[in-house]
Design a protein with these regions (language model features):
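Gly/Ser-rich, low-complexity
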Residues: 1-104, 109-127, 143-156, 160, ...
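Helical hairpin unit composed of two closely spaced alpha helices linked by a short loop
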Residues: 298-339
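Small-residue-enriched core segments of transmembrane alpha-helices in multipass membrane transport
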Residues: 125-136, 156-164, 193-199, 230-244, ...
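Membrane interface segments of multi-pass transport proteins and intramembrane proteases
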Residues: 116-120, 219-235, 333-342
Length: 381
């Protein structure tokens, strides 16, 4: 009977250790996780908001490229070509409007010199007529700029609305439970406050500033310049306060939440390792799984930053082209025409500069939020 028991034990031993088993490598784990994350909503949001995307990249393609090849997986040449093509396209689009403004101003400067010798009253009336026409052109162009800025911020918040839940899920899978909750709340808070600020503070504030600048230069003496400077200072102060608050909250959460997550995950790993017989195997599998999820999480963060750059390029380049053209037109017209015309066009350039600052700060808020949470949770227990 003894030899029968030994034979049965030997058969069981050989059956357990020699039976073919499926073994998953790190790549298999990451492929399986990528399928479970379901990035379709983020891909749809990106396709909806990004026009003329280089090489037809999707968000999931970018994540897979970062996972497989790192930064070498993204073609820098295609992105650079996209930027240059977009920049020169915007220059060609805004050129006719500024040719009209410069032509009207030069013609007024020429005929104004003739009219001033006849009658000062006729000269002033002709200035009001020409200034009204130029002011209408400037307001028309600035309304287009406002729509571009509002649309650009809207596309950014739309993408972030689709990205935040997916990224929070990835944080949760990587063992960063507290960090996932803090990121979810902070990021959606930024989206909500930014939408309200654009609707009730920044867009109306810049509109009032531009109107005050144009009305101020309607008179020979400055009457509304200090009021316009007050609005300009208020907008810049709101941007600085918002950036400081978000950075402060992000830094505090990046210090506390990841430490809490590290403590809880470390305790879990140590508990698995304490199990006799299979503890080390469970601990090794857990570390492999955690490393895969962190790799996917960081790749998603890098892809999101790249998408934010692409989303911000189009509106930023459009506003930048208008800003450069306004400043250039003001510099060209200053030696020939009335000082008030040149100063009013320069004031429009300052309004474009405020819009550039608003868009830069909006992108920077999301950049800092994603970067801080990705860097602070990029550890393997």
């Amino acid at each position: 009977m003894v030899w029968v028991k030994k034979s049965v034990a030997m058969i069981l031993f050989l059956g357990i250790f020699l039976m073919p088993q499926t073994v998953y490598a790190a790549e298999d784990y990451m492929d399986e996780m990528m399928q479970k994350l379901k990035l379709d909503e983020v891909d749809d949001a990106m396709e909806k908001n990004v026009t003329q995307l280089p090489d037809k990249y999707t968000f999931s393609d970018m994540v897979q490229s970062f996972v497989a090849e790192g930064t070498d997986g993204i073609s820098r040449d295609n992105i650079c070509d996209y930027v240059f093509d977009l920049f020169f396209y915007e220059i060609a689009a805004v050129k006719p409007l500024f040719i009209q403004i410069i032509s009207m101003s030069i013609l007024f400067a020429f005929f104004g010199k003739l009219l001033v010798t006849k009658s000062q009253y006729v000269s002033e009336m002709s200035f009001f007529v020409v200034y009204t026409g130029i002011m209408l052109l400037l307001l028309q162009s600035f309304q287009l700029i406002s729509e571009v800025v509002e649309s650009g911020i809207g596309k950014t918040t739309s993408f972030m609305t689709a990205f935040i839940p997916t990224y929070a899920t990835t944080l949760l899978l990587s063992g960063n439970t507290a960090s996932a909750g803090s990121f979810y709340g902070l990021a959606f808070g930024i989206v909500y406050v930014l939408e309200l600020a654009m609707k009730f503070l920044f867009i109306p504030g810049v509109h009032i500033y531009v109107l005050l600048v144009l009305l101020d230069h309607l008179f020979e003496e400055s009457k509304l310049s200090k009021f316009a400077e007050l609005f300009e200072s208020g907008i810049y102060l709101a941007l600085k306060v918002g950036l400081a608050v978000v950075m402060g909250m992000g830094v505090v959460q990046s210090l506390i939440a990841p430490a809490k997550d590290r403590l809880s995950v470390s305790s879990l790993y140590q508990g698995f390792k304490a199990v006799p017989g299979v503890g080390n195997s469970c601990g090794a599998a857990g570390e492999l799984l955690g490393g895969c999820t962190i790799m996917i999480k960081n790749s998603m963060g890098a892809a999101a930053l790249l998408v934010l750059v692409i989303l911000g390029l189009e509106p930023v380049l459009k506003v930048l082209c208008f800003h450069v053209m306004y400043r250039l037109a003001s510099a060209v017209l200053q030696p020939f025409c009335d000082k008030r015309l040149a100063e009013s066009i320069a004031g429009m350039g300052k309004g474009c500069g405020i819009y550039l600052k608003i868009m830069w700060n909006a992108l920077l808020l999301f950049f800092l939020t994603i970067s801080m949470i990705a860097a602070s949770t990029g550890f393997i227990n």
